[in-house]
Amino acid sequence: AEELVAEGKIGKVKQTMGTGPHRQGNYERPKWFYERESYGGIITDIGSHQIHQFLVFTNSNEANITHALVENTTKKQFPGFQDFGEINLTGNGGHGYIRLDWFTPDALPTWGDGRLFILGDKGFIEIRKYTDLAKSDTGNHLYYANNEEVKHIDCSDVKLPYFRNLINDVLNRTESACSQELTYLTMELAIKA
């Protein structure tokens, strides 16, 4: 997706919409999992990843949270637990909406149906990260449409440089995977939300 955006396939990015659904599971979780003071809440725990994607794809180095909400609807016996969250952001490169939840149904063959939608002024991209619902149990599906074409790309064999670069950054004290400024801004926004 980064390559397609950089090539201008969808024009200037206007908005991202990211989802971070997870499965609670039918097994015993450690006590800290339900204590906000320990895990930080659903927005810092899960939403930080979608905030990072928003900043990267909108090319924003400044952003504000315009709306944030968290709820606990399924585990009232654990008042610190949050099973739903949403965030609206406005950055100096675009807008974003993020939805997070612990509601993945048991029948889904993976732990969540994570998606990322990137809207540009000349097209859009949809990434189906972990499953292609009712079509394929595998993830890494990218769809895009612009004024010239509509395309599906199976990205399951695409090598992603991020983790290799991250390891290199740790070993060599470099910032090739992600700058410290971007990491700090991501977490600042997650904490503020």
Predicted regions and their residues:
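Contiguous beta-strand/loop segments that form the cofactor/metal-binding neighborhood of enzyme cores
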Residues: 52-133, 163-174, 191
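Predominantly a Rossmann-like dinucleotide-binding segment in NAD(P)-dependent oxidoreductases
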Residues: 1-79
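Active-site loop of classical SDR/Rossmann-like NAD(P)-dependent oxidoreductases
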Residues: 153-164
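C-terminal helix-rich "cap/oligomerization" subdomain common to oxidoreductases
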Residues: 149-150, 166-193
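Short polybasic amphipathic segments
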Residues: 116, 132-147
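Short acidic, glycine-rich loop/turn motifs
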Residues: 89-93, 143-149
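Short, hydrophobic secondary-structure boundary micro-motifs
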Residues: 13, 66, 128, 152, ...
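A generic structural signal for residues located within well-ordered alpha-helices
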Residues: 46-49, 158, 178-185
